[in-house]
C-alpha cells in the first residue's frame, strides 16, 4: 500500500495515452509550457526596475451632484 513502483506508473501512463491520445497530450503539454513561460515573463516584468505608470484620474465637475441626506421621520 506504500509507494507505487515504476510498473504502476507505466500502466497508468499507457491507460492515459489510450484514453486521451498522444496528440491531445502533446497539446496539453505545449499549453502548459506556454502558461509557465508567460508566468515567468510576468514575474520578470514585475521585478524589473521600471517605475509603474501613474494612472491619473480626471474629475468631471458636471457629473458631480451635491446632496444632503435627511433622516426620515414617521408622522
UniProtKB/Swiss-Prot annotation:
Q: Where is this region: Disordered?
A: 44-75
Keyword Transmembrane annotated: yes
Gene Ontology terms: biological process:
protein transport by the Tat complex
Which keywords fit this entry according to its UniProt record? Cell inner membrane, Cell membrane, Membrane, Protein transport, Translocation, Transmembrane, Transmembrane helix, Transport
A Pfam family that the UniProt record links to this protein? TatA_B_E
According to the lineage, what is the superkingdom?
Bacteria
Query: What cellular component GO annotations does this protein have?
Result: TAT protein transport complex
- Give compartment(s): Cell inner membrane
Q: How does it sit in the membrane?
A: Single-pass membrane protein
A GO molecular function annotation here is: protein transmembrane transporter activity
Q: Does the keyword rRNA-binding apply?
A: no
UniProt-listed Gene3D superfamilies: 1.20.5.3310
The leader peptide range reads: none
InterPro entries for the chain: TatA/B/E, TatA/E
Q: Which residue ranges traverse the bilayer?
A: 1-21
**Oligomeric and partner information:** The Tat system comprises two distinct complexes: a TatABC complex, containing multiple copies of TatA, TatB and TatC subunits, and a separate TatA complex, containing only TatA subunits. Substrates initially bind to the TatABC complex, which probably triggers association of the separate TatA complex to form the active translocon.
Tell me its family. Answer: Belongs to the TatA/E family.
Write down the PANTHER family for this protein, in alphabetical order. Answer: SEC-INDEPENDENT PROTEIN TRANSLOCASE PROTEIN TATA
- What is this protein's function per UniProt? Part of the twin-arginine translocation (Tat) system that transports large folded proteins containing a characteristic twin-arginine motif in their signal peptide across membranes. TatA could form the protein-conducting channel of the Tat system.
Identify this protein by name: Sec-independent protein translocase protein TatA
Amino acid at each position: 500500500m506504500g509507494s507505487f513502483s515504476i510498473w504502476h506508473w507505466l500502466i497508468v501512463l499507457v491507460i492515459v495515452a489510450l484514453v486521451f491520445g498522444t496528440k491531445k497530450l502533446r497539446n496539453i503539454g505545449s499549453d502548459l509550457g506556454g502558461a509557465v513561460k508567460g508566468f515567468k515573463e510576468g514575474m520578470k516584468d514585475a521585478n524589473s526596475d521600471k517605475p509603474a505608470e501613474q494612472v491619473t484620474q480626471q474629475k468631471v465637475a458636471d457629473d458631480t451632484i451635491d446632496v444632503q441626506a435627511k433622516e426620515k421621520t414617521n408622522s
